[in-house]
Curated annotation (Swiss-Prot):
Keyword Transit peptide among record annotations: no
Organism: Drosophila melanogaster (Fruit fly)
Official protein name in the record: Cytochrome c-2
Family classification: Belongs to the cytochrome c family.
GO terms for MF: electron transfer activity; heme binding; metal ion binding
Amino acid sequence: MGVPAGDVEKGKKLFVQRCAQCHTVEAGGKHKVGPNLHGLIGRKTGQAAGFAYTDANKAKGITWNEDTLFEYLENPKKYIPGTKMIFAGLKKPNERGDLIAYLKSATK
């Protein structure tokens, strides 16, 4: 099916509502319950410096891109069993597309 083209502004709203309590996106942003996501695209799982990842995240060994994020964000615990991310996921493909569009722009 592919990743739907997303709307950055809608994605930003989703991030604020669903992600910002645990993640930051800006360069040099602090880790919260979840890691800072700056530089996410092109980074391997479990690689944000200074964040204590689960072994499951470190061992997954995939590189974050549109396709891997699209699958992960639907159901994080299914994609990486053992992750400590408590987010249930975004079931609607267009919402995942919007969030990915935002993450691509906000984490460069």
